[in-house]
Structure formats: C-alpha cells, structure tokens
UniProtKB/Swiss-Prot annotation:
It is an enzyme of class 2 (transferase). Belongs to the ABC1 family. UbiB subfamily. Keywords: ATP-binding, Cell inner membrane, Cell membrane, Kinase, Membrane, Nucleotide-binding, Transferase, Transmembrane, Transmembrane helix, Ubiquinone biosynthesis. One of its GO terms (biological process) is ubiquinone biosynthetic process. Its EC number is 2.7.-.-. Residues 123-501 form the Protein kinase domain. Its main location: membrane. Signal peptide: none annotated. This is Probable protein kinase UbiB. It comes from Shewanella sp. (strain W3-18-1). Is probably a protein kinase regulator of UbiI activity which is involved in aerobic coenzyme Q (ubiquinone) biosynthesis.
Length: 549
C-alpha cells in the first residue's frame, strides 16, 4: 500500500465519520474491535447529527467525488440491499463536475488522432458542451462533409484515479466480509466487483462506440429509437466522435408539452423498446437515466427516443431470458409455486432450498400487490421484491440481472412520468406471450431445427462412420467394464479369504492362550498357538493390495 493510497484511505474514513455513518450501522455490524477502532479516531466528530442516514450517505459520496458518486448511483438500484429511504436519496446523486481546461482536451484529442484538430475538423469549440466525471464533450464540424459532430474525450489521468479508488474499495469490502458476519449477507466484495466491471467498461470509448454502432443497427428505420451515427474511423480508447443531435431532454416535460408531444404513444414506445432490446436483440442499454435520453423535435405527434451513452450495455443468456419471461407471466397469474420453481431451476437460488418455504415467502411479499389495479402494479418493483425475497434464501445475484432490474426501474419510472395512466402490463403482456410462444411452441422447434439443418446435412455423410465408431467404442467399453468387474470379484474373493484366515488365527491364538491355564494335554496349547501364528501369516500374505477400479 503506497503513501498516496494511505492518505486517500484516511480521507475516505474521515469523511464517512464526519457524516456519522458509523452511528447508523446496526449493533451486530459493530463488534468490539470496530468500536475500539472508532474510539481511536476520537477527534473526528459527526457534524451532521440532525440529518437522516440516507441523506448523510448521499452527501458523503458527493464529497468523496466521481467514483463514489457513480457507486452511489449504482447502489440506488440495489434495493435488495438498501432500504427504500436510502435508495431514494442515492438516486438523487448527480454525475456533474466542473469541466477541465479546453486546452487540455485539445491536447488529449490530438494525441489520440495523431493529427491536429484543424486538419480534420472545423469550428472546434474549446468550451465543453457537457462535462461528467469520466469524460467531457466538445462540438465541431467535419471537414470532409460539413456535418456537426461531438467529440467525447476522457479526463486526463482519470484511469489512475479510478483504479486507486477501486483498489481501496475492494480492500475495504474484503475486510467487511472477513470481520462482519452481516457483511457476508450484504456481500460488499460482490457489489464492488460488479461496480468495477461496470466503471472500467466506461473507461474505453472505443468499446462504447462499438456498442452504439450495434444498437443503431438493431434499430435502423425504427419508429421508436434513433441512435446517432458513430464515425468509427475517429474512435479510440480515449476518444469517440459521433453525430450531433438536437433533441429535447426527456426530463423537460414543459418543452415536450409545448411542442404537442403524444405522451401516451411515447410512454408505450419506451416499454416496447425495453422488451425489444431484452428479448428480441438480447442487447439492452443499461444506463437509461434521463440525462442519456432525448426526444425528437420533429413530428411530435409521432415522437421517438434518441439514445446516447452506450458505455453500459447488458445481455442475458437464453436460459435467463426464458426464466425471466416465465417469471413475469407466473406473477400475473399469481402462480407462486411456479415462481419458486423457476428461481431454483434457473440456478438463481440453490436447489437445496426448501421449495414450500420459498413459495410461501414469495406469496407473503407479492399477494398484497394485487390489492391494486393491474395498471398501478410496478414491474420493476415486482422484480425487485422477488430478488429481495430470494436474497434471504441465498440467491446467487447475477450482475446482468441487476442491470436489467435497474433499466426496468428507469424505463417504468420514465413511462409513468410521461403518461401516469400507462398500463405497463397491458403493453408488455402481449409481447411476452408472443415471445414465449416463439420460444417453446412448434414454430420455435421448427426454427431451431431449420437453424441446425445446414450443420446436420454437412455431417450426414459421416453418420455411418460415426455409428460404427460408437459401436466399436461401446464394445470396448463393455469389455473394459467386464475386465474391471472380474478384477473386482477376484479382489473381493481374496479379501474374504484373507479375513477368514485372520479371524481363524485370532481364535486359535486366544484358545492356545486359554489352554495354558486349563488341564489340557501338554501339547494342545502349542498346537493352537502354532496353527494360529501360521494361519495369521498366511492370511496376512494373502491380503489383496489396494486397487482403484
């Protein structure tokens, strides 16, 4: 551990204690050695006693800087770990930091391009259009075609700062898991590892560019989503160049109303977009907060979304997708037994879980939701409550499912902000039922067979030879099994014979010893003892050696 990391560690601890976060921990998470360590830092006082715990945590993370702000944003979606009060406070964290000097941005851009900005772009503006914790955005126009573009460039030395903070977080999380029993349930090391993977992905703008290209191709000619064109020839790990868009921020409801936006259609398209990305494309935007979503200015009666910032994308396995779809359908059919089965079958919960106890726990949580009309039931909170319940049964949390839960909460919240009467179930159910029919019905089987047909037809000439080889292998296997069985039986026979001889020798030796004290003929004890020793020797020599079969 370097001197710099020690200083940073002290600053983090000091900040957390100044916000009194040690005081909001439950007693079982504060053993005697924790109390002793806190007492040794007696000069650091809680300066925010009047504020609730969730607000203290939010302010502390805000003060600690960008890496902790992003961690707080991620934790705000983990309501299986945090209370609603704390999660709501963390959701208010804003990833806004002062911009860095435009001259430094120019140098960083030219270092990636290995050329001057003026040789490729006109009207480069050193004043940033937007600034965040990891990157900054500048505007320009392309010399080649005169089109307006934005240049997204990483902050200087941002990687080193993030890696240093991640290392400190990881060490702290490991200590928590080691010392605190409750820490194992909260799995801090797992949370930090998920965060590490997410934030390191955001540090590679070339990867973000490839994600944006893929998402754009998935929705070419779509009425629901537009992804700006990426100029791949100008994209590098620290630089990304893309088409500039002129939309209305989705959070600017007043501007959307002023242009006469069709909010009902917009909200329904948001839900359709989510399910299309997850179930049709298996590639979904996992950072769809309001800052990354704009609405088209043209044709407000037929509006579409404009998606930005593809640094965090999610995918699900085919198995996870099917179980997830079945989960939603089972919930709205109130089939709690099937939900419990699905969690176990999918491997999300251990197969050793008591099915009846798990089913009852799900029922206790979910049944009260049906006191509301269907259009008031939150899809995101259904998924959240199911995962929270499963947590008490040691669910194996899948990072991709956490991303999905976060995205669903964003989309659902956004949809109901745009159109409060949005019936998410009515919009989503036909999509899910159609997708399930395509996956498990006759059409799905025919499609899978059709997909495999070219491979099978290519292998068809080899079938006779494969059958012959398998029969030959089968005969060898049977012969080998018979040989092993013969060896095993012989081994057992030898073992029985040896045991018989050893037991008999023990009996003779005992009898010979007893006869010395009886009125027996002079030679009787010696015959028994000699016979016993001889039989013991024969039995010992005839013992089978240990063999593995």
């Amino acid at each position: 551990m370097t001197l710099t990391s020690i200083r940073r560690g002290y600053h983090v601890i000091k900040t957390l204690l100044q916000y009194g976060l040690d005081e909001v921990l439950p007693p079982k998470m504060t053993p005697w050695y924790f109390t002793l360590a806190r007492s040794s830092l007696f000069w650091i006082r809680n300066k925010h006693k009047s504020k609730p715990g969730g607000e203290r945590l939010k302010l502390a993370m805000q003060e600690l800087g960008p890496v902790y702000i992003k961690l707080g944003q991620m934790l705000s979606t983990r309501r299986d770990l945090l209370s609603d009060e704390w999660a709501i406070e963390l959701a208010m964290l804003q990833d806004k930091v002062p911009p860095f000097d435009g001259v430094l941005a120019r140098k960083a851009i030219e270092a990636e391009l290995k050329a001057s900005i003026e040789s490729l772009f006109d009207d480069f503006d050193e004043t940033p259009l937007a600034s965040a914790s990891i990157s900054q955005v500048h505007t320009a126009t392309l010399k080649s075609n005169g089109k307006a573009v934005v240049l997204k460039v990483l902050r200087p030395n941002v990687e080193a700062k993030i890696l240093a903070d991640l290392q400190l977080m990881s060490q702290t999380a490991n200590l928590l898991e080691y010392f605190l029993g409750e820490g194992n349930r909260l799995r801090p090391a797992e949370v930090i590892e998920d965060y590490r993977v997410t934030i390191l992905g955001e540090l590679n703008l070339k990867l973000e560019a490839l994600n944006a290209i893929k998402l754009r191709n998935n929705f070419l000619n779509s009425d629901a989503l537009y992804v700006p064109y990426v100029y791949e020839e100008f994209c590098y790990p620290r630089l990304m160049v893309m088409e500039r868009i002129y939309g209305i921020p989705v959070s600017d409801i007043a501007a959307l109303k002023a242009q006469g936006t069709n909010f009902k259609l917009l909200a329904e398209r948001g839900v359709e977009l989510f399910f299309t990305q997850v179930f049709r494309d298996n590639f979904f935007h996992a950072d769809m907060h309001p800052g990354n979503i704009f609405i088209s200015r043209d044709h407000p009666e037929n509006p579409y979304y404009i998606g930005l910032d593809c640094g965090i994308m999610g995918t699900l396995s085919e198995v996870d997708k099917r179980y997830l779809a079945e989960n939603f359908l089972a919930f709205f059919n109130r089939d709690y037994h099937r939900i419990a089965q699905l969690y176990i079958e999918s491997g999300w919960v251990s197969e050793k879980t008591d099915l009846q106890a798990f089913e009852q726990a799900i029922k206790v949580v979910c049944e009260p939701m049906f006191n509301k009309p269907l259009d008031e039931i939150s899809f995101g909170h259904v998924l959240l409550e199911l995962f929270r319940t499963a947590r008490s049964f040691d669910i194996v949390v899948q990072p991709q499912l956490v991303l999905l839960e976060k995205t669903l909460l964003y989309i659902e919240g956004l949809g109901r902000q745009l159109y409060p009467q949005l019936d998410l179930w009515q919009t989503a159910k036909p999509f899910l039922e159609q997708w399930m029919a395509e996956q498990v019905g006759p059409k799905a089987m025919f499609k899978k067979v059709s997909t495999k047909l070219p491979y099978w037809s290519d292998k068809l000439p080899e079938f006779p030879e494969l059958i012959y080889d398998n029969l030959k292998l089968g005969r060898k296997l049977l012969s080998s099994q018979q040989q092993m069985l013969d060896k095993y039986l012989k081994h057992q026979q030898q073992a029985h014979k040896s045991n018989y001889m050893l037991i008999t020798s023990a009996v003779l030796l005992i009898c010979g010893t007893l006869l010395f004290n009886q009125d027996a003929t002079l030679w009787s004890p010696y015959v028994c003892l000699t016979s016993g020793v001889l039989m013991w020797f024969i039995g010992w020599r005839s013992r089978p050696k240990n063999r593995k079969f």
